[in-house]
């Protein structure tokens, strides 16, 4: 047995010959770890480590997947949610403007963390925000992926958000300051918790760690609906401000300390390695293979080309099937674009005849008898 000097509490490490096991005990001689003769290890508590899989509730946190725009710089739609990189959408309703892109070089290629990042660039400034004006990056975590946190019950669990961020601009004062991240119940938005963090210097990656306590009340989505929505504010809504570090019973986006990142043209923000995990400890970022990350993203959005050929006798229709690579979260909104190399009529199918979570079936009119071939690009959107 052993204890600290002046502390009566003791722990012990013993070898039990009868059971042929090494036993580790802590305060009060409670058994915590046992190594049996067959090599099996039994622990009485949870194993906490930096390399177990399945920790991260965020999809595409390392910003590798960008099905919609690739690395093309894209202006954020005003007054509308706009998906850029997979699973991440942005909202911008200020009097200024900003662009977003996936970057794989420069700051993103530093020796800190992943080699990709999401970059926000202010292209037109708004120096005085009012009402709900904001610039926000968001991901909605599907209920299946967060319902085990038991939000809305007495057993609600804490979760920890970690990410790496870098800001730069014409001068440090343009971007340094206090920023906010909020958590809210998707769809209802009547529970919200705000956390603050600071950007202290420009041109330096900073890892931020924020712990959110479990919310024991309110309605939180489960199953394939939206559960927890997380928002990163680069400019915050003045009419939706609230105190940090407490659960609110109405929607709050940021605190009164929130920096207006839209205030100066050519402010840049880079963010990557976003992770959300159960508990109060931020472990190292969980890297998944590109194929696995892409498949996770395709549950919510997928685009691909389909082609085929069919003989039509008379003015009839050609059936066009789209079999998804990954089963969708829900029946998707599907758009189709006819490739110019085909010989079908029109630029998109006449109608979608079947729409399921595993695929869709449309038909396209033909001009008359003959062989018809088609090349279609479809986009299936089942985002939250």
What spans do the regions from the language model cover?
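Low-complexity, small-hydrophobic/phenylalanine-enriched stretches
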Residues: 1, 13, 22-24, 28, ...
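Self-maturation zones of extracellular/virion spikes and adhesins
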Residues: 1-29, 94, 100-105
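Short, mixed charged/polar active-site loops
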Residues: 8-10, 30-32, 190-192, 205
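Extracellular and organelle-lumenal recognition/adhesion modules and their flexible linkers in secreted
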Residues: 40-384
């Amino acid at each position: 047995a052993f204890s600290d000097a002046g502390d009566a509490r003791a722990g012990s490490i013993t070898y039990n010959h009868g059971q042929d096991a090494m036993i580790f005990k802590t305060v009060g001689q409670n058994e915590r770890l046992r190594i049996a003769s067959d090599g099996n290890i039994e622990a009485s508590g949870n194993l906490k480590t930096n390399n177990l899989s399945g920790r991260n509730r965020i999809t595409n946190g390392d910003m590798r997947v960008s099905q919609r725009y690739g690395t093309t710089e894209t202006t954020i739609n005003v007054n509308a949610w706009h998906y850029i990189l997979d699973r991440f959408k942005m909202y911008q309703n200020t009097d200024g403007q900003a662009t977003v892109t996936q970057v794989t070089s420069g700051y993103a290629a530093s020796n800190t963390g992943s080699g990709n990042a999401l970059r926000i660039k202010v292209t037109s400034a708004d120096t005085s925000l009012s009402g709900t004006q904001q610039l926000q990056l968001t991901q909605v975590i599907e209920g299946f992926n967060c319902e085990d946190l038991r939000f809305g019950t007495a057993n609600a669990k804490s979760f920890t958000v970690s990410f790496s961020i870098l800001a730069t601009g014409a001068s440090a004062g343009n971007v340094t300051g206090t920023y906010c991240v909020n958590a809210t119940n998707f769809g209802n938005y009547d529970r919200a918790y705000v956390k603050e963090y600071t950007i202290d210097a420009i041109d330096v990656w900073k890892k931020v760690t924020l712990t959110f306590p479990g919310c024991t009340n309110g309605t939180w989505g489960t199953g394939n609906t939206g559960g927890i929505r997380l928002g990163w504010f680069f400019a915050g809504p003045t009419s939706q401000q609230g105190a940090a570090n407490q659960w609110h019973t109405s929607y709050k986006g940021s605190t009164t300390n929130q920096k207006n990142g839209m205030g100066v043209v050519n402010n840049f923000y880079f963010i990557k390695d976003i992770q959300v995990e159960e508990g109060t400890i931020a472990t190292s970022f969980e890297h998944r293979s590109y194929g696995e990350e892409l498949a996770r993203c395709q549950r919510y959005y997928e685009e691909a080309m389909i082609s085929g050929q069919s003989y039509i006798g008379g003015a009839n229709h050609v059936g066009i099937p789209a079999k998804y690579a990954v089963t969708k979260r829900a029946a998707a909104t599907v758009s189709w674009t006819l490739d110019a190399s085909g010989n079908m009529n029109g630029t998109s199918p006449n109608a979608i005849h079947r729409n399921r979570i595993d695929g869709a079936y449309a038909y396209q009119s033909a001009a008359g008898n003959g062989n018809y071939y088609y090349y279609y690009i479809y986009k299936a959107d089942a985002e939250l």
